[in-house]
């Protein structure tokens, strides 16, 4: 039984008993037993564990987890302490520096964002080592779409940051006029220069939150 230790438990309990999820669970059980899978089994739902539904102010959507050793720990774009900062996150930090004058930290551990209400959600929550997108189409997308739909139903305004075509596909799930979505190309080095750099999404997010009487995010990740 999955225990998230916050309000997500009640919200998702029916979802975890749906046929698609039970099938996904069986697939994962076999994958974890026979192959190297990231993140660690106990880290899969860290995004939900660190950011309760009631606390969600911002959603940053990723695709699937990092597939290198020691990187993924259940939050989009974040890596574990002591691991080299991946290129996409380097570009996120560069944009934060240019946008809000944040100092570029020496780590990619984004838990301080999650603890302030930034849900760092990948649309697929597991991956085989070294094989990007290897767990696509197994059922994760149904669950994460449901999570996005639930956040869409929130009364309190939420900012959605949708970077790249995969994330932008989720715009169709966002029907609540109280929320706002900012879109751009992905921060990957392959595309960042075509519109991510200079997007100012972080200052725009805080401006929107403040306009709605919500405490803004302190985007500065401390160096360790």
From Swiss-Prot:
Pfam families, sorted: UDG (PF03167)
Catalytic activity entry: Hydrolyzes single-stranded DNA or mismatched double-stranded DNA and polynucleotides, releasing free uracil
GO cellular component, one term: cytoplasm
EC number, as in UniProt: 3.2.2.27
The gene coding this protein: ung2
Superkingdom field: Bacteria
GO molecular function: uracil DNA N-glycosylase activity
This protein's name: Uracil-DNA glycosylase 2
Family to which this protein belongs: Belongs to the uracil-DNA glycosylase (UDG) superfamily. UNG family.
Main location: cytoplasm
Species assigned in the record: Listeria innocua serovar 6a (strain ATCC BAA-680 / CLIP 11262)
């Amino acid at each position: 039984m999955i225990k998230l230790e916050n309000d997500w438990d009640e919200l998702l309990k029916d979802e975890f008993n749906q046929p698609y999820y039970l099938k996904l669970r069986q697939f994962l059980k076999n994958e974890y037993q026979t192959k190297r899978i990231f993140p660690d089994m106990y880290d899969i739902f860290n995004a939900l564990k660190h950011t309760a539904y009631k606390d969600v102010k911002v959603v940053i959507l990723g695709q699937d987890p990092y597939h290198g050793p020691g990187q993924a720990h259940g939050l989009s774009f974040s890596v574990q302490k002591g691991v080299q900062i991946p290129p996409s996150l380097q570009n996120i930090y560069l944009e934060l520096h240019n946008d809000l004058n944040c100092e570029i930290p020496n780590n990619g551990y984004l838990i301080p964002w999650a603890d302030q209400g930034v849900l760092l959600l990948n649309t697929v929550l597991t991956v085989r080592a070294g094989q990007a997108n290897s767990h696509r189409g197994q059922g994760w997308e149904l669950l994460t779409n449901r999570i996005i739909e639930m956040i869409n139903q929130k009364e309190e305004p939420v900012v959605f940051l949708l970077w790249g075509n995969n994330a932008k596909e989720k715009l169709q799930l966002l029907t609540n006029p109280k929320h706002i979505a900012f879109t751009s190309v992905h921060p990957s080095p392959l595309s960042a220069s075509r519109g991510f750099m200079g997007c100012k999404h972080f200052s725009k997010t805080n401006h929107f939150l403040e306009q709605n009487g919500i405490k803004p995010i302190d985007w500065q990740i401390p160096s360790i």
